Amino acid sequence: DGAQFWTPYGATECLPVAVIEGRELQSTRNATEQGAGTCVGRAVAPNLVRIIGIDDAAIAQWSDDRMVADGVVGEITVAGPTATDSYFNRDAATHAAKIREVLADGSERIVHRMGDVGYFDAEGRLWFCGRKTQRVETASGPLYTEQVEPVFNTHPDVKRTALVGVGMPGQQRPVLCYELQPGVPESRRTEVVEALRAIASRNTHMAAIDAFLCHPAFPVDIRHNAKIGREKLAVWAAR
């Protein structure tokens, strides 16, 4: 009973960024299933984790004016000894993901853009809301995968879901793709869709989701089965 299990959050370019103990993670599960995102814990010192407004363009120079308030979803950035300064022989990638910051003493450091979106809660915990490139930009505002999919994943007949956008950013139609659990007959698809539609109607920020498509097997990263190929699913959903 006294054992502790810590789960890190990070990336190849910076690991770890934050950590969370198993019991705390379990205690946040209800919030995750209600659309809060996934709590990944507190930043690992001496890393400095800050949230900036979402911007798809490169950012050459750091400015504190870009930072957003606690509770506001933005892009996660990290500065610290575990963050890389550049990509080897990949200048375009370095330009897109690295920000140069001038400190008060005149020295400089590199800030890494995680490419993930999230926010800090009132307790200083970091919440992961998905990949920046996989957000869905609707006419009524953005939807983030990790604030949507876990809510629908609570349906017992659903194995997993994937939120994708069809159309131009700013006017995208949100589409929820889903896989049925093994053994669930195809004849239940209509019933499942009605249940998913009811879930959407109970959550204000998901009310715009009115398209539900059953997919036989999501495309995934061959290295990480949990990484769903939402870009490929979006092409499929648009057909």
Residue locations for each model-derived region?
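Active-site glycine-centered loops adjacent to acidic/histidine catalytic or metal-binding residues
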Residues: 10, 41, 116
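Conserved ATP/PPi-binding loop(s) of AMP-dependent carboxylate-activating enzymes
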Residues: 42-46, 54-102, 141-143
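Residue-level recognition of short loop/turn positions
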Residues: 48, 55-56, 64, 103, ...
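Generic structural signal for well-ordered beta-strand positions
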Residues: 59, 68, 121, 127, ...
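AMP-binding/adenylate-forming catalytic core of the ANL superfamily
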Residues: 80, 85-86, 95-96, 102-205
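Conserved C-terminal "lid"/linker of ANL adenylate-forming enzymes
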Residues: 162-167, 175-176, 197-239
